[in-house]
C-alpha cells in the first residue's frame, strides 16, 4: 500500500491475501501547525455539544489551544483529570460518565495513551464519535480499534472504534517528555518481534497472515530506524516519522482485524510489568516499550 498517511483515510479494497482491508478514519493530519485545522476538520459539528477530555499536563500543552479554537462555533464542555499518573480503570471511566453532558455530539480527546484509550471506549459505549488530538508520540494506539483498560487490577483489551479524526501537531509532539519520545520509538522497534510472532502463529497455528500489511509495517520500521538518531535532539522530521509510523501501526491492526501486525510477546511482558507496579502500590507511570529503549 504505497500511500501517504493522509491518503490512508477511507481506504477500502480487496487484498491479494483474500481479505477486504478498510480504514474507517475520515481525517489524519500530521505536521507543523495542524492543530489549527481542527475547527475545519469537525465543521459538521458546528453549533453542537463537544466534550473535551484531558489532564492537567495535556491541557497546558494543547487543551487551551483546542478550547480557544472551538469556543466561538461550538458548545464546549470539558473535564480535566488532575491525577499525576492517570490509569485507564473503572474509577476513571466512571468519572467521565458523571461529567459528560447528556446530549454530547462529539468527544475530543487531548492526550496520548490513557486519554485516547478511555475516550475511545467511552465513545464506543455511548455511540458518540471521537477525535484525538495527540500530544506525544509515545504509543501506537492513536488509530487502533481496541482499548486496553485496567479492570479489577488486570489489563484487559476491550472493543472500541476508529477515531473520526487524528490530529498530531508536530510542534506539540516534539516537545513531549523525552521518555515518551523514546517509548514511541521503542514501540515501533517492538514490531520486529511482533511480526516474528505473527509468522510463528501462521506456521504453528495456521493463523491468517497478510504479506502486504507486513510490508507496510516494515516500511515504517525502516524509516524510523534511519531517523532514530534525531530523537534526542527532538528533530521535527524524526518525530513526524515516528508519529506516522505509530499511526500506521494502529491502522494495520484495523486492516487485518487483529493485533498481530503490531503486538506480540513484548506486549504481554509490558502489560505484566504495568500490572505488577500498579498492584504493588507503585503509581509510577509505566510506558509501554521502555524495555525497548533501554539501550538508546
For each of these PLM feature ranges, what is it?
Residues 20-22, 45, 99-102, 123, ...:
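Solvent-exposed alpha-helices and their adjacent loops that cap or buttress functional pockets
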Residues 100-122, 126-136:
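A short, small-residue-rich loop immediately preceding and capping a beta-strand
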Residues 110, 139-143, 148, 273, ...:
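Active-site histidine-anchored catalytic micro-motif
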Residues 214-294:
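Active-site segments that bind and position negatively charged phosphate/pyrophosphate groups
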Amino acid at each position: 500500500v504505497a500511500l501517504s498517511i493522509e491518503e490512508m483515510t477511507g481506504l477500502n479494497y480487496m487484498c491479494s491475501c483474500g481479505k477486504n482491508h478498510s480504514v474507517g478514519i475520515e481525517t489524519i493530519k500530521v505536521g507543523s501547525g495542524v492543530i489549527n485545522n481542527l475547527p475545519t476538520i469537525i465543521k459538521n459539528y458546528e453549533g453542537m455539544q463537544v466534550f473535551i477530555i484531558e489532564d492537567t499536563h495535556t491541557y497546558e500543552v494543547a487543551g487551551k489551544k483546542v478550547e480557544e479554537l472551538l469556543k466561538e462555533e461550538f458548545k464546549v464542555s470539558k473535564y480535566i483529570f488532575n491525577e499525576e499518573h492517570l490509569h485507564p480503570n473503572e474509577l476513571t471511566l466512571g468519572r467521565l460518565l458523571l461529567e459528560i453532558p447528556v446530549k454530547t455530539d462529539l468527544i475530543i480527546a487531548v492526550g496520548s495513551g490513557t486519554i485516547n484509550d478511555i475516550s475511545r471506549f467511552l465513545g464506543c459505549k455511548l455511540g458518540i464519535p471521537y477525535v484525538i488530538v495527540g500530544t506525544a508520540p509515545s504509543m501506537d494506539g492513536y488509530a487502533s480499534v481496541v482499548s486496553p483498560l485496567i479492570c479489577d487490577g488486570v489489563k484487559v483489551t476491550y472493543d472500541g472504534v476508529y477515531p473520526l479524526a487524528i490530529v498530531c501537531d508536530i510542534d506539540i509532539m516534539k516537545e513531549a517528555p523525552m521518555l515518551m519520545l523514546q517509548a514511541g520509538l521503542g514501540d515501533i522497534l517492538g514490531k520486529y518481534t511482533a511480526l516474528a510472532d505473527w509468522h510463528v502463529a501462521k506456521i504453528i497455528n495456521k493463523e491468517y497472515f497478510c504479506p502486504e500489511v507486513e510490508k507496510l509495517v516494515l516500511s515504517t520500521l525502516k524509516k524510523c530506524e534511519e531517523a532514530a538518531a534525531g530523537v534526542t535532539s527532538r528533530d521535527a522530521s524524526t518525530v513526524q516519522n515516528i508519529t506516522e509510523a505509530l499511526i500506521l501501526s494502529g491502522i494495520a491492526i484495523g486492516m487485518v482485524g487483529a493485533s498481530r501486525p503490531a503486538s506480540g510477546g513484548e506486549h504481554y511482558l509490558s502489560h505484566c510489568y504495568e500490572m505488577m507496579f500498579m498492584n504493588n502500590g507503585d503509581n509510577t507511570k509505566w510506558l509501554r516499550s521502555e524495555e525497548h529503549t533501554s539501550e538508546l
